[in-house]
């Protein structure tokens, strides 16, 4: 896990619920600090004009819903990068498109990712992308592999969520409600149809399992809930691999 601290993030997402869900998950993780929200590309530049450069983001999350063509995506990314020096642009897609992946790479983005692949791991993903030239997610890899050329051969595939196989479904649900969503034990107990004591037992066991699988060090002032959130939403570093496009036919071999 990369423990960057205080990465400033701006989120551009046309969907109100998506915008605020991403904001919420990033707020839980002290590695990231959301500095601005907007639902339009134009809103990005309007906000930048009103703020001092010291307030500008280190990372820009960009939704493509209102971007109609690959050329437009490339142009938007290029414009953002021309305005903000060294910014990391992360493109989030609903459905992966090969031509948009190439446009993101050509524009200088550091990631072209399917939202459902990223999931709860959005803060861990942003931290991980700080040291990656260009990444795609597993959903993008599956869709584009049969049709793309070798221009994406340098892309790295985003790791999936750290698995924690010992976590049962009920423990996962309790952690999701109490750690990720911030519910009290009483409210989570009502949601799951068990006693608050049982919820606390689930959480305690979940903490133990995740801590046993984690070799990272955390700041002393970080609460147990914060550490649990970071562990639950961590990436599986052992799953990192490079995108491998399909092999081209070997011209030295006789063809039928």
Residue map of PLM features:
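N-terminal regulatory/sensing modules of transcriptional regulators
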Residues: 1-149, 250-256
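Conserved long hydrophobic alpha-helices within structured protein cores
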Residues: 34, 38-44, 57-60, 168-169, ...
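Glycine-rich, flexible loop segments associated with nucleotide phosphate handling
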Residues: 55-60, 73-76, 169-170, 191, ...
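The cytosolic transmitter module of two-component sensor histidine kinases
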Residues: 122, 141, 160, 221-226
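Charged, solvent-exposed alpha-helical segments that act as regulatory interaction surfaces
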Residues: 135, 150-158, 212-216, 238-241
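Helix-turn-helix DNA-binding segment
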Residues: 154-200, 204
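Basic, Lys/Arg-enriched C-terminal extension of HTH/homeodomain DNA-binding domains
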Residues: 204-256
């Amino acid at each position: 896990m990369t423990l960057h601290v205080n990465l400033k993030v701006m989120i551009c997402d046309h969907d109100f619920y998506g915008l605020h869900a991403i904001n919420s998950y990033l707020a839980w993780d002290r590695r990231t600090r959301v500095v601005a929200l907007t639902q339009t590309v134009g809103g990005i530049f309007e906000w930048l004009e009103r703020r001092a450069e010291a307030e500008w983001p280190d990372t820009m999350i960009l939704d493509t819903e209102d971007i109609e063509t690959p050329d437009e995506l490339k142009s938007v990314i290029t414009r953002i990068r021309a305005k903000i020096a060294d910014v990391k642009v992360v493109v989030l897609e609903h459905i992966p498109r090969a031509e948009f992946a190439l446009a993101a790479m050509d524009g200088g983005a550091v990631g072209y990712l399917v939202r459902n692949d990223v999931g709860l791991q959005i803060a861990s993903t942003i931290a991980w992308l700080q040291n990656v030239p260009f990444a795609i997610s597993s959903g993008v890899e599956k869709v584009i592999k049969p049709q793309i050329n070798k221009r994406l051969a340098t892309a790295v595939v985003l790791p999936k969520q750290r698995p924690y196989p010992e976590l049962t479904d009920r423990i996962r649900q309790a952690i999701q409600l109490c750690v990720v969503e911030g519910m009290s034990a009483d409210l989570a107990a009502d949601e799951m149809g068990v006693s608050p004591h049982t919820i606390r037992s689930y959480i305690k066991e979940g903490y133990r399992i995740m801590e046993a699988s984690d070799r990272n060090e955390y700041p002393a002032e970080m609460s147990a809930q914060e550490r649990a959130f970071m562990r639950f939403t961590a990436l599986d570093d052992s799953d990192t691999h490079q995108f491998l496009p399909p092999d081209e036919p070997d011209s030295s071999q006789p063809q039928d």
